[in-house]
Amino acid sequence: MDINPLLYLQAFNNDATTFNTQGHLLEQQSDSPYFDTFANAMQAYLDTKRGGNDEEGTIIIMDDEDFNDSESLEDFLQMLNDEELNDEFSSDDEPEERVNFHEVNHHEVNHHKINHHEVNHHKINQHEPSENPQATFDITEFIKTEDEED
């Protein structure tokens, strides 16, 4: 059974509970049963999407403007990750230009000046992850009962 996450996001779109991209609970103004329903709905989606409740997932409450600008949940989450990565660096820290080695015009390279012992063509930039890091969390970390909050 495939569950559409957008249905859950739309259903709880007007909730006053706000999360950041790391999944920390920033503000909870809704009543506890409503929040528990939201958390259970999100957990059901994660269980279905990821194949079990041991995996981590991302929950974002989108406002209507963000939702309408994004074609899908994946596009929206990628947009958030891109913004988060851009915000992590100041202009002084970030390199001015990143070279994509796959786009280098090899006809302009003078192969006689390359020290082949220092070049490993198969492990270019191996210390950087191949994909953008995903902001994830375990939803069970902040699902609380009223007794635990006191």
Curated annotation (Swiss-Prot):
Where do transmembrane segments lie in this chain? none
**Official protein name in the record:** Uncharacterized protein D129L
- Indicate whether Repeat appears among the record's keywords: yes
Q: Where is this region: 5 X 5 AA tandem repeats of [FH]-H-[EK]-[IV]-N?
A: 101-125
Q: Is-annotated flag, keyword Repeat?
A: yes
Q: Which organism is it from?
A: African swine fever virus (isolate Tick/Malawi/Lil 20-1/1983)
Record key words, sorted: Repeat
Q: Where are the sequence repeats?
A: 101-105, 106-110, 111-115, 116-120, 121-125
Tell me where on the tree of life, at the top rank, the source sits: Viruses
Q: Which family does it belong to?
A: Belongs to the asfivirus D129L family.
